Amino acid sequence: MIRILGEGKGSKLLENLKEKLEEIVKKEIGDVHVNVILVSEDEIKELNQQFRGQDRPTDVLTFPLMEEDVYGEIYVCPLIVEENAREFNNTFEKELLEVVIHGILHLAGYDHEFEDKNSKEMFEKQKKYVEEVWGEWRSNPSEDSDPGKR
């Protein structure tokens, strides 16, 4: 199960995609609870400094907790996601989907910073999942998915 915490840009889209994201979690990790938490630029910068020693904001950070009630948490900064979307000539919605799936794969044990083989497999899976979910969502967007609130 996925819980979307935090409000603002992206929260409605993630709620609309929750079922598909839960399928990925179940396939990659199992029947576990994952929190996706939308945070400000200052909050993600503080977390990045505290846990990675990087004094800058980032788009996504993943923390495996492996507790009984929550397996892990994925922190996402919509502002940085939006900046990256512009930089990579992507839509905000697709970039948001990419970072959340990226976080899910990190929770599943994939690592792209230290293992080349694992990195290749991770990004191949990420691309496959993004295309599957994005394609389905684009062909059947929910009636209540207001682009201004996604």
Curated annotation (Swiss-Prot):
One Pfam family of this chain: YbeY
Obligatory cofactor(s): Zn(2+)
Key words of the record: Cytoplasm, Endonuclease, Hydrolase, Metal-binding, Nuclease, Ribosome biogenesis, rRNA processing, Zinc
One MF term in the entry's GO annotations: metalloendopeptidase activity
Chief subcellular location: cytoplasm
EC number: 3.1.-.-
Compartments where found: Cytoplasm
A single BP term in Gene Ontology: rRNA processing
Entry's family note: Belongs to the endoribonuclease YbeY family.
Function text: Single strand-specific metallo-endoribonuclease involved in late-stage 70S ribosome quality control and in maturation of the 3' terminus of the 16S rRNA.
Protein name: Endoribonuclease YbeY
Gene name tied to this protein: ybeY
